[in-house]
Curated annotation (Swiss-Prot):
Primary gene name: gltX2
Protein family: Belongs to the class-I aminoacyl-tRNA synthetase family. Glutamate--tRNA ligase type 1 subfamily.
Free-text function comment from the UniProt entry: Catalyzes the attachment of glutamate to tRNA(Glu) in a two-step reaction: glutamate is first activated by ATP to form Glu-AMP and then transferred to the acceptor end of tRNA(Glu).
Source organism of the structure: Wolbachia pipientis wMel
One GO-annotated biological process of the protein: glutamyl-tRNA aminoacylation
First-level EC class: ligase
Tree of life domain: Bacteria
Motif ('KMSKS' region): 238-242
The protein, known as: Glutamate--tRNA ligase 2
Subcellular location: Cytoplasm
Length: 440
């Protein structure tokens, strides 16, 4: 089994094509298959090596690896061979209409109630007419000639049986007048040459698939298995304001864990519940492409945020040890305590600093804090220290427990909310507790 992910390096990856990449990757890894990364960069003016590097970085960040990769710009010689072969066999023909002329035809067809399908008038041109057009400075574009008598059928892994009548489809342009190949011919050539067995993409490519099946047949190659995922809809206003959906760059900036994104995207639109999972292999083992519904799915940023904290709660110390070392946290005990109290990993550093560094205590009642200082239990802090401390203070002062907890937390952490104070005292330590109470 071989799947492929084929991004165009003309911009950043967004959640839509990352979802496709994840599904492709998990689909083949579940079957011990291979995964191919291909960059569709035939439009050299719009493609940028910067985006190739960004895409590679983002895929690695998510956890996707690949068995081989290449750029289509390295294979123009091969595309030219296939192009000339298909011209020779009568599958590709030259057209001389300008964009303006094609637009007029399209509008006229729509006005008359006909589908805007190319009328193949270029096939009626004589050699003299073609020469005259070229003498006028017109450069041809080229189309693949569809078999309009065929209804293309395939059993889609997600959408079930699909039938496309090619009589309602225009012959696709495979090469523009400027000599640049469109998506169609290089994509089909690569899929055939590299023996891609399974193609996963968005349902907006369904008509393209019918066209490509005919092109694959023209090359006398084996038809791969297709799966068309329903498109994602974005309901969060925060997302809708971003052009092109939500890109991985902004996901990173929002401090979403890779496995929170993965957990969400591979289950979104399936019959399975969306649950946090910190282990990629368990998601691969349970993956089933047939679980995807053919109905569109709603992407919710707020739901992904909720998953983020749950993923952090599942992460073992070994999974985050390098990241913890980078911020000066070497304690597994602290990680297992704090992971249940954070929404983003960056909050670990905040609470470690509160425990171990100089902070500005917030003293709400100086007299009460003096009493608390004198009532502090002897010895090192443990999980019983806070309850003993509170009991002793309340024997001296008439104060509600909730108010007392707030006063102590503010004095010791500089905040009014946070992780369980009884356990936090252990990490703050007796020396820091004394210093913070004594200062004021």
């Amino acid at each position: 089994m071989l799947t492929r992910f084929a991004p165009s390096p003309t911009g950043y990856l967004h959640v839509g094509n990352v979802r496709t990449a994840l599904v492709c990757w998990m689909y083949t890894r579940n079957q011990n298959g291979k995964f191919l990364l291909r960059f569709d960069d035939t439009d050299l003016q719009r493609s940028d090596v910067k985006y190739i590097n960004d895409i590679i970085e983002d895929l690695k960040w998510i956890g996707i690896d690949w068995d081989a990769s290449f750029k289509q710009s390295e294979r123009f010689e091969r595309y030219n061979e296939v192009f000339l072969q298909l011209i020779k066999e009568g599958h590709i023909y030259a057209c001389y209409e300008t964009r303006e002329e094609l637009d007029i035809k399209r509008k006229l067809q729509l006005k008359q109630g006909f589908p805007p399908v190319y009328d193949r008038s270029a096939l009626l041109l004589t050699e003299q007419e073609k020469i005259r057009y070229e003498q006028e400075g017109r450069r041809p574009h080229f189309r693949f000639k569809l078999d309009r008598n065929e209804v293309v059928k395939w059993n889609d892994e997600v959408k079930g049986e699909i039938n496309i009548a090619t009589s309602s489809v225009s012959d696709p342009v495979v090469k523009r007048e400027d000599g640049i190949y469109t998506y169609m011919l290089p994509s089909v050539t690569d899929d055939v040459d590299f023996n891609v067995t399974h193609i996963v993409r968005g349902e907006d490519h369904v008509t393209n698939t019918a066209v490509q099946i005919q092109m694959i047949k023209a090359l006398k190659a084996k038809i791969p298995t297709f799966a068309h995922l329903p498109l994602l809809h974005f309901d969060d206003s925060k997302i809708s304001k971003r052009k092109g959906g939500l890109d991985i760059k902004s996901i990173k900036e929002d401090e979403i864990e890779p496995m929170a994104l993965v957990s969400y995207l591979v289950k979104l639109g399936t019959s399975n519940p969306i649950e946090a999972c910190a282990c990629m292999q368990s998601l691969i083992d349970s993956f089933d492409i047939k679980k995807f519904s053919s109905a569109s799915a709603q992407f919710s940023l707020s739901e992904m945020y909720k998953l983020n904290s749950k993923v952090l709660q599942q992460m073992l110390f070994e999974m985050v040890q390098d990241r913890l070392n980078q911020i000066g946290v070497g304690s597994s005990e602290f990680w297992y305590f704090i992971r249940n109290n954070i929404e983003r990993f960056s909050e670990v550093a905040k609470w470690w600093k509160i425990c171990k560094s100089d902070i500005e205590p917030v003293i709400l009642d100086k007299e009460l804090i003096k009493i608390a200082f004198n009532a502090l239990p002897q010895g090192d802090c443990n999980e019983n220290t806070l309850s003993e401390w509170v009991k002793t203070i309340r024997q001296t002062v008439d104060i509600k427990a909730k108010n007392l907890f707030t006063q102590l937390r503010s004095a010791l952490t500089g905040t009014e909310t946070g992780p369980e104070l009884a356990k936090l005292l252990i990490f703050i330590g007796k020396e820091n507790i004394i210093a913070r109470l004594k200062e004021k």
